[in-house]
Amino acid sequence: MAHKKGAASSNNGRDSESKRLGVKRFGGQQVKAGEILVRQRGTSFHPGENVGRGGDDTLFALKAGAVQFARKRNRRTVNIVENVEAEPAKA
């Protein structure tokens, strides 16, 4: 019977911190300019209309509006559809 734990058990017990990746704002949600839409490693989602891409591939809103997910040329894209405010009707 061993009186020491052995190399394996004492070498285990480490884990990296979670990176909190994923979609942060979903389709139809209203966002302001600068809000983060998707945190990702690589380009699972590509930037579309009114969406910018950061150095770590984070997608963020360039303008205020509603989030819209779409497919373009077999790529998943994220767009921001600007809010078009209707003018009051003139009588």
UniProtKB/Swiss-Prot annotation:
Which UniProt keyword terms apply here? Ribonucleoprotein, Ribosomal protein
Please give the coiled-coil regions recorded for this protein.
Answer: none
Q: What does the entry list under GO cellular component?
A: cytosolic large ribosomal subunit
In this chain, the stretch annotated as Disordered covers 1-25
Q: Which domain of life is it from?
A: Bacteria
Q: Which GO terms describe its molecular function?
A: structural constituent of ribosome
Concerning its family, UniProt says: Belongs to the bacterial ribosomal protein bL27 family.
Q: Which organism is it from?
A: Corynebacterium kroppenstedtii (strain DSM 44385 / JCM 11950 / CIP 105744 / CCUG 35717)
The entry's protein name is: Large ribosomal subunit protein bL27
Q: Does the keyword Amino-acid biosynthesis apply?
A: no
GO BP field: translation
